[in-house]
Amino acid sequence: MTMQTMTAASGHDAEAGTPPDGPLLALDGITVTFPGVRALDAVSLSVRAGEVHGLMGENGAGKSTLLKVLSGVNQPQAGTLTLNGTAQRFASTRAALEAGIAIIYQELHLVPELTVAENLMLGQLPSRLGVVDERTLAARALDALERLGEHIDPGIPVKYLSIGQRQMIEIGKALMRHARVIAFDEPTSSLSARETTQLFRIIRALRAEGRAIIYVTHRMEEVYELCDRVTVFRDGRRIDTFDSVADLDRDRLIGCMVGRSIEDVYGYRSRPAGDVLIEAKGLAGPGLAEPVSFTARRGEIVGFFGLVGAGRSELMKLLYGAVRPSAGHVELNGKRVAFGSPRDAVRAGIALCPEDRKQEGIVAIASVADNLNISARRHFSPARVLLDGRRERELAQKYIERLAIKTRDGDTPIGALSGGNQQKVVLARWLAERIDVFLMDEPTRGIDVGARAEIYNLFYELAEAGRTVILVSSDLAEVIGVSDRIVVMKEGRIAGEVAKAHATPDALIKLALPR
């Protein structure tokens, strides 16, 4: 569906979103305080009709609190909120929705057991004589799905949909309520590349209709691709608003978010490399088009860069024993090793921090201490019969302090932590195992810039201690800023290697692009 047909289908919705002169949404001097914390400090922000306005900042910068003010969850102690020229004060989320503001949160607010149609019309189900009018319900749901370009059966329960499809249902709910302002909170964090492309298409269509879009993200590439303007928050304050994203220097944007220069974020520290620690010789397997060979030395951070489908994650799984190679082998400290499982790799000194941290790296409902001790327990209780609770608590506390993991204590569910602190717990798990080779697959994805700097510092400490870090990253600035040298993969094979002195975005992209 094109933007034109989507706009035409929306009819009066687009008209309803047309403001008088000035911004569609304006916040002036908004202040929100909690016991001992000023979450928002006299924040002012304006969002125009027909624009995508990005919000960036580290965790705790105030972005989520701002969304909660817009949605009526949090009541400001000072300041005014104006919508379409009229001052508003929302006592509830329902009041905000009725006024025309919808929030698409990271954790989607759908009822899994209800159908697509029922979720789309939740709270406003059409009825006759107190009975749901199924025909009208289905017709309205189909209309909403058509406007989104989604071919989904409105009669199936939402629990059978993908994350991307569920997100489209959330957007459909906002359209059904004629929302003029739609805010997205980290919307691509769980989406595939195809689903992200679909989401961006919809957001551009909503912008073309004259709606005001607020887009909260940690991902700078998304800001440059999608946003017209961007506002940066730090420590509850609005630091700056940039009116032309296309002309915005990336280093300046990072500096605004963290209050320091990009050099300080990556903080690269050179060090001498030692002997070869790990070597792949003719390694072949699923996702690799030809045998792969490379070496990594003690004290090195070796970056692996490539586009989606280049085979980097598949190579990491072969090194980690998660997938058995069809040919070739791995050598560790000059000795040939073969792993029947990841457990064998860990015992040999190789660990993987997987790309999908939430699904493969942590047990979200378990505590920080339990997640940290998953592998170390075999040292406490070789027979695996009894758990040593005291030693586990002591180990957890040791690494909470050593890695500055922001958590109340080791009993806190890891799912309650930020992405950066979850990643620190995964790293701590392997530090407790005396690992020599750290395979880091997209380790900072979805993590704010400040937490990234802390993780990079951990990498440098590991390398300085004679360990090897293999960093798989799709972030050009990251892989150039942190790595000692960079291996570029393309279409399941190694396309080349670039020394740090010659590592530029153009050099890496030229090697990574398909033939």
UniProtKB/Swiss-Prot annotation:
Places the protein is found: Cell inner membrane
Catalytic reaction list: L-arabinose(out) + ATP + H2O = L-arabinose(in) + ADP + phosphate + H(+)
EC number in record: 7.5.2.12
The ABC transporter domain, residue ranges: 25-260, 260-511
Chain sites annotated for binding ATP: 57-64
GO molecular function, one term: ABC-type L-arabinose transporter activity
Designated gene of the protein: araG2
Entries under InterPro entries matching the protein: AAA+_ATPase (IPR003593), ABC_carbohydrate_import_ATPase (IPR050107), ABC_transporter-like_ATP-bd (IPR003439), ABC_transporter-like_CS (IPR017871), P-loop_NTPase (IPR027417)
Name of protein: Arabinose import ATP-binding protein AraG 2
Function statement: Part of the ABC transporter complex AraFGH involved in arabinose import. Responsible for energy coupling to the transport system.
Family the UniProt entry places it in: Belongs to the ABC transporter superfamily. Arabinose importer (TC 3.A.1.2.2) family.
Membrane topology: Peripheral membrane protein
Entry keyword Isomerase: no
Domain of life: Bacteria
Organism this protein belongs to: Burkholderia cenocepacia (strain HI2424)
Region annotation (Disordered) ranges: 1-22
Record keywords: ATP-binding, Cell inner membrane, Cell membrane, Membrane, Nucleotide-binding, Repeat, Sugar transport, Translocase, Transport
PANTHER family: ARABINOSE IMPORT ATP-BINDING PROTEIN ARAG (PTHR43790:SF6), CARBOHYDRATE TRANSPORT ATP-BINDING PROTEIN MG119-RELATED (PTHR43790)
